[in-house]
């Protein structure tokens, strides 16, 4: 900042207006500061109090501000400019927008500022300008590195090896192509072509001729039946007609397995001991002779079953006495 533009030291109310804060907030801050200062005054030495009273004068305030400005201005002049920063060096070659021309007075001021600066700053500026990036320098550096690599013996061997490999890989394979072209590429044989080939085979012709000879031979005719054989066959057929075939024994229907526990408990699945083997044999004979079986209901007991079986084959002439004789003796 320039000395002329720098504002002088202001009192409390002027500082509040200069900063732009509200008066209420500024007054509260000033009151708190004055209260703290009054609390610290008894502990301050008399020399410091004298300096504090001198600080209220305008001449003292101006001298302090001038000293501050001179001290910081020297530091600002020693510092490097933003234009010489390394981050802006790469953009130095790019076209810039036309700016205002500098007058003679501006040039003199810049020269004076450079002369006032230390020689170290000039050296830094020269170094930063020398390290400017450009595509031309990058290409030249790469070419120089390649030349250095090629001059080394290991690099020469590697390039020679790569050259030989490329020559071998790029040679045309004429001989292999001729062999590949000589191989026929016809389709696979079909069923008709295989059959035609088999027909042309001489062995197949011999086998086919033998089969034809066997088929061409006349088959032997069956001998004519004699006069006695005719009558013998007729007698056999009459005997078979007189003795009819026995009717097939019908299979007993099995009781289907119960689906619930209660049916299994209250249903009779086996024959009780009351039926003797004699009665069972009689029952088989009657069923084979008659060819009809009576269906047994599930709710019948063994005693009812036995009686029902007998009633199924009783005639009108039978009596209760005859029925009782057929029962077992132990009843």
UniProtKB/Swiss-Prot annotation:
Claim: Cell cycle is one of the keywords in the record: yes
Highest rank taxon of the organism: Eukaryota
Pfam families per UniProt: Msap1
InterPro entries: She1
Alphabetical UniProt keywords: Cell cycle, Cell division, Chromosome partition, Cytoplasm, Cytoskeleton, Mitosis
GO biological processes: cell division; chromosome segregation
Region (Disordered): 90-127, 150-183, 206-331
Main location (coarse class): cytoplasm
Keyword Secreted: no
Single Gene Ontology MF annotation: microtubule binding
Biased composition (Basic and acidic residues): 154-165
Compositional bias ranges of the Polar residues kind: 267-280, 288-299
Subcellular location: Cytoplasm, Cytoskeleton; Cytoplasm, Cytoskeleton, Spindle
Family named by the database record: Belongs to the SHE1 family.
Role played: May have a role related to the spindle integrity, which is essential for proper chromosome segregation.
Name of this protein: Mitotic spindle-associated protein SHE1
Gene that encodes the chain: SHE1
């Amino acid at each position: 900042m320039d000395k002329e533009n720098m504002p002088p030291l202001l009192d409390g109310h002027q500082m509040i207006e200069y900063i732009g804060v509200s008066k209420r907030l500024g007054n509260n801050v000033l009151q708190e500061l004055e209260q703290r200062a009054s609390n610290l005054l008894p502990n301050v030495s008399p020399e410091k109090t004298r300096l504090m009273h001198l600080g209220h004068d305008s001449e003292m305030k101006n001298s302090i501000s001038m000293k501050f400005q001179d001290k910081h201005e020297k530091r600002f002049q020693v510092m490097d400019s933003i234009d010489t920063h390394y981050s802006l060096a790469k953009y130095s070659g790019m076209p810039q927008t036309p700016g205002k021309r500098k007058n003679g007075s501006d040039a003199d001021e810049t020269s004076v500022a450079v002369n006032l600066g230390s020689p170290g700053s000039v050296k830094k500026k020269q170094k930063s300008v020398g390290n400017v990036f450009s595509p031309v320098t990058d290409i030249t550096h790469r070419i120089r590195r390649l030349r250095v690599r090629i001059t080394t013996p290991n690099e020469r061997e590697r390039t020679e090896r790569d050259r030989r490999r490329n020559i071998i890989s790029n040679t045309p394979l004429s001989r292999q192509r001729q062999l590949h072209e000589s191989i026929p590429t016809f389709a696979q044989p079909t069923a008709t072509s295989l059959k035609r080939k088999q027909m042309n085979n001489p062995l197949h012709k011999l086998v086919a001729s033998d089969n034809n000879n066997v088929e061409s031979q006349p088959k032997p005719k069956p001998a004519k039946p004699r006069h006695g054989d005719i009558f013998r066959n007729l007698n056999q057929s009459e005997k078979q007609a007189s003795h009819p075939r026995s009717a097939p024994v019908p299979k007993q229907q099995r009781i289907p397995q119960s689906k619930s526990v209660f049916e299994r408990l209250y249903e009779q699945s086996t024959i009780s001991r009351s039926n003797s083997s004699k009665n069972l044999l009689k029952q088989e004979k009657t069923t084979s002779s008659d060819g009809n079986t009576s269906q047994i209901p599930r709710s019948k007991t063994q005693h009812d079953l036995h009686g029902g079986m007998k009633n199924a084959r009783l005639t009108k002439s039978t009596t209760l006495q005859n029925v009782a004789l057929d029962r077992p003796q132990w009843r």
